[in-house]
C-alpha cells in the first residue's frame, strides 16, 4: 500500500474539486483572459488524478496536449484509467517534482492546490518557469485560506461564533513559520511571479458560489451538503484534549485554543443538511508570461 498521503485522498479530491469553478468561467479565462487560440502543450505540477486536465482540455484548442506529474503512484494509475477512455493527448509521469528537472518544451505550466503543500514554493515556481518556452505562461490556481474562511455564511447564527478569523490568521502564520507550508500562498503568487521575472502578471479569483438552498432538489442538496462537509465545513472536531494540545503546539495560547475548539464544535453542531449556507472557496488564479530570451547571434541577424 502506498505511503504517500494523497494516494489515500482520491475520493476526497473527486468529491470536492467541483466546488471551485463554473465551466463557463474557465472557458472565459482560456479564451478572453489568457487568449489561448492555438494548440498548447501543458504540464501540470502535482496533477493528482488529472482534474485540471479534465476541465481544461475540452475548452482548449484541438490538438492541445496535457502532461501530468505527481509522486502518487495510485493517483497516476487512477489518472491513466480515466484518460484512457478519453480522446485527449495526455501523459502521466510518477515523479518527485522537487528533485526532477523537466525539459523546457511546454507552452504552459500549471499548478492547482499544490504549492500550499510545498515547504519552498518559490523553488517549485522556478522549476515551473524553467519548463516553459519563451512567451509561454505559468498559471497557478492556489488557495487563500483566510479569504476562504471569511467567505461562508451559515444562516441564523453569528458568524464570529463559528469562524474566529483573527485566531485562524495567527494559526496559519504560525504554521508557515514552523513548516514552510502556507495555505495563504494564493494571494502571494502574483508578487512571486513578478519577482521571478515574469511579465504581464495578473490574478483572478474563482467564481463559484455554492448555495445550500433548502428549496433545491433533494438529490442536489444531499450531494452539495456532503461535498461541503468533506471540504471541511462544519466537520466535527476530534477529542477536545487532542485538539487543544495540537493547537497549543502550533503556537496558540490556551485561551485562543479554547476559543478555536469551541468555534469548530459550534459550527459542527449548527451545520446540518437542513441549514441554509453560502460558501465561496475564493481560490486565487495567478498567471504571467515567461520572457522570450533570444541568443546573441539571433539578435544580430
What is each model feature region?
Residues 1-24:
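Class I SAM-dependent methyltransferase Rossmann-like catalytic core
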Residues 2-5, 202-275:
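C-terminal helical/coil "lid" or tail adjacent to the Rossmann-like core of SAM-dependent
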Residues 20-40, 55:
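Conserved alpha-helix/loop element of class I SAM-dependent methyltransferases that forms part
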Residues 43-45, 49-99:
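Class I SAM-dependent methyltransferase SAM/SAH-binding core
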Residues 107-122:
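A short SAM/SAH-binding and catalytic strip from SAM-dependent methyltransferases
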Residues 123-137:
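A short glycine-rich, Lys/Arg-flanked "PGG" loop and its adjoining helix->strand segment in the class I
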Residues 140-142:
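Acidic carboxylate diad motif detector
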Residues 144-230:
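Conserved catalytic/acceptor-binding region of the Class I
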